[in-house]
A protein has these predicted regions:
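N-terminal small/polar loop signature for handling phosphorylated ligands or for N-terminal nucleophile
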Residues: 1-60, 154-186
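Gly/Ser/Thr-enriched, mixed-charge loops and adjacent short helices
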Residues: 61-185
Length: 186
């Protein structure tokens, strides 16, 4: 996501997987978590990782693991993975940043995600109503800006107004007290 150093951390995580001979698909830039969940199934992956602190304050970052069904890792698999991580000898891992081993998945997944979202969502609004419906959208400086406008356009919504002050992804969330849309301060 747009948190500080997420792109750098993504490359480090990729290096660890390369060391263990695990194929890596990677977005070259931030994407919203639901797009990762979609990509797991679409690409027939076993697991995926999102580097995010969700709606926590800007000084945080995190590491969330998603299983092949697109959902977050849950017990007992989470504890099993933690045991494997704790047993690692980190000095053996070579961080060589081999870009040739990364398979970037940007546009193909973006398009498939938007198409699937429109096909599977309840966009039963008649075309004329879509053209007359005014939508105001904010990503609260987050990654959803990478997907939502395209999904709405693909669904036929033409009058989408993006809040310009909060359009650019920014891990400091400069115009909001909280990046959590569930909180009134947001």
């Amino acid at each position: 996501d747009c948190r500080h150093n997420s792109n750098t951390l993504a490359k480090v995580v990729a290096d660890v997987f390369f060391f263990f001979c695990i194929h890596v698909y990677l977005f070259s830039d931030m994407r919203p978590t639901p797009e990762l969940s979609f990509a797991l199934n679409y690409l027939n992956c076993h697991a995926g990782i999102v580097l995010t602190a969700s709606h926590n304050p800007p000084e945080y970052n995190g590491y969330k693991v998603y299983w092949q069904d697109g959902g977050q890792l849950v017990p007992p698999q989470d504890k099993e993975i933690i045991q494997v991580i704790e047993a690692l000898n980190y000095s053996e891992i070579k961080f060589e940043a081999n870009e040739n081993l990364i398979e970037y998945i940007d546009v193909a997944i973006d398009e498939a995600f938007a198409k699937s979202t429109v096909e599977n969502a309840s966009f039963n609004t008649p075309t004329a109503a879509k053209e007359n419906l005014k939508i105001v959208y904010t990503s609260l400086h987050g990654t959803s800006i990478k997907a939502i406008p395209g999904v709405l356009a693909k669904a036929g919504y033409t009058d989408v107004n993006i809040v310009p002050e909060q359009e650019v992804p920014n891990g400091d969330f400069p115009t909001v007290k909280s990046p959590n849309p569930e909180e009134p301060e947001a």
